[in-house]
């Protein structure tokens, strides 16, 4: 893959830089540049309130080293000590922040986006994604609205600390109490990304018979026709090898989707239902409560309520799930896309940890993932269509389009409470997402097509 043509010192208009649902993200050379990273690093160093080092991790993208260096330069210019972790899963960063009492951390990754994109996620001293107030201060600094007087103390220094990844691996093993998986045939799709740093190693350490797909760090192939957004290679490998289960990760390994031994997909809703049921049966699920987002399937919600459970819904984004779990004291939450958060394991979305939990729970009960999935809910037919809307203001203000909102209301009336419509602007890509689910699959197809066509017609009009 050829490198994109851009001037390395270009910087996007600061007025256009804002944190989305998962930090800053975009095409390297236009939305994300080394100059922007330098400034973001500096302002992170200024606004993070706690003392201590600032940790920086990265996925395998070829632009990652450039951006890590720029962030470290900005942070040290602001007087901060920096520890660079090298290639690691995103959840390693908040875990190590908490372990060492660090001031915060950054992850250079664009998650499931294509290789030519990159991004910056920022974490506070508690390991959670940075709150909106501090994000706003960083944005204000980029716009020149925060004072930038010289620090009274010396500049900081940067230290390479890739050795700390071993501590994260030990935390993963401890999360399942080192329970053995001797001889269990498991396929792992490591997506050419962050999961290559530890995914195969921890499963092999527990004795699993591991088959690895896309198992080297490759910044030009990360997420390309593999991983949690392209499950067919994993599904095919599980069936060909007669594996008990398979797990696919995204580029930075903070999410995971699974495939059972029959080739059926186990998405985040099923993970929540099955793991939540295990916690409920063990009497360790406070208020029988799970937290999910507006994208979670209606079949999941009704099946969980039939078990006597409560389901709280949040906007899309694991930071919203995190906030709701903290408020309610929920033990488990997540997203259909595979971000799963457990209060017993640090409240950070962690794909490798979730995969270990599923494998351990199944093996401990003497059942297969397919057996377990048979006990799960029947999902309502659901379809998601992405409509490309390059104009950000139109995308964000789609609800102001009366023709589109009227059509949404018509669709909801026609389903008479046995289905729903969700239209939302993506926080990470120039897309309007249109989702319809209903008991009647014909209604799903009909309304998805009509709504997507209407969105394209009205929001992309000249």
Curated annotation (Swiss-Prot):
Q: Which GO terms describe its molecular function?
A: magnesium ion binding; phosphoglucosamine mutase activity; phosphomannomutase activity
Could you say which residues bind Mg(2+) here?
Answer: 111, 250, 252, 254
What is the cofactor note? Answer: Binds 1 Mg(2+) ion per subunit.
Question: What catalytic activity does the UniProt entry give for this protein?
Answer: alpha-D-glucosamine 1-phosphate = D-glucosamine 6-phosphate
Q: Which GO terms describe its cellular component?
A: cytosol
Q: Which cofactor does it need?
A: Mg(2+)
PANTHER family for this protein: PHOSPHOGLUCOMUTASE (ALPHA-D-GLUCOSE-1,6-BISPHOSPHATE-DEPENDENT), PHOSPHOHEXOSE MUTASE
What name appears for this protein in its UniProt entry? Phosphoglucosamine mutase
């Amino acid at each position: 893959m050829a490198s994109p043509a851009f001037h390395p010192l270009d910087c996007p208009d600061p007025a256009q830089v804002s944190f989305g649902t998962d930090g800053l993200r975009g095409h390297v050379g236009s939305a994300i540049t080394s100059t922007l990273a330098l400034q973001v690093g500096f302002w992170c160093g200024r606004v993070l309130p706690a003392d201590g080092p600032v940790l920086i991790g990265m996925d395998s993208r070829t632009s990652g080293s450039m951006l890590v260096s720029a962030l470290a330069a900005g942070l040290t210019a602001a007087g901060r000590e920096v520890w660079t972790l090298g290639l690691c899963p995103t959840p390693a960063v908040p875990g190590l922040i908490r372990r060492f009492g660090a001031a915060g951390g950054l992850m250079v990754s664009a998650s499931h986006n294509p290789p030519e994109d990159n991004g910056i996620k920022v974490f506070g001293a508690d390991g959670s994604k940075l709150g909106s107030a501090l994000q706003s201060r960083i944005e204000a600094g980029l716009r020149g609205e925060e004072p930038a007087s010289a620090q009274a103390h010396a500049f900081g220094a940067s230290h390479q600390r890739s050795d700390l990844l071993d501590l994260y691996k030990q935390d993963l093993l401890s999360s399942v109490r080192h329970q053995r998986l001797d001889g269990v045939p498991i396929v792992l799709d490591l997506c050419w990304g962050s999961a290559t740093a530890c995914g195969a190693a921890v499963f092999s350490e527990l004795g699993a018979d591991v088959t690895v797909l896309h198992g080297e760090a490759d910044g030009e192939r990360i997420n390309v026709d593999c991983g949690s957004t392209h499950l067919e290679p994993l599904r095919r490998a599980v069936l060909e090898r007669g594996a008990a289960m398979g797990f696919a990760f995204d580029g930075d390994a903070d999410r995971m989707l699974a495939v059972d031994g029959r080739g059926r997909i186990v998405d985040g809703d099923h993970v929540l239902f099955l793991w939540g049921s295990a916690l409920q049966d063990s009497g360790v699920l406070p208020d029988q409560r799970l937290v999910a987002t507006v994208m979670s399937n209606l079949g999941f919600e009704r099946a969980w309520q039939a078990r006597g459970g409560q389901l709280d819904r949040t906007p899309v984004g694991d930071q919203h799930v995190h906030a709701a779990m903290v408020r309610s004291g929920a033990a488990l939450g997540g997203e259909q896309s595979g971000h799963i958060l457990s209060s017993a394991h640090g409240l950070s979305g962690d794909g490798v940890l979730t995969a270990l939990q599923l494998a351990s729970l199944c093996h401990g009960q003497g059942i297969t993932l397919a057996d377990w999935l048979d006990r799960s809910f029947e999902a309502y037919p659901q379809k998601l269509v992405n409509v490309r809307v390059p104009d950000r203001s139109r995308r964000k203000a789609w609800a102001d389009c009366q023709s589109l909102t009227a059509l949404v209301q018509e669709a909801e009336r026609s389903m008479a409470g046995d289905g729903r419509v969700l239209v939302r602007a993506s926080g990470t890509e120039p897309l309007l997402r249109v989702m319809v689910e209903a008991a009647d699959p014909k209604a799903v197809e009909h309304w998805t097509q009509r709504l997507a066509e209407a969105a394209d017609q009205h929001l992309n009009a000249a």
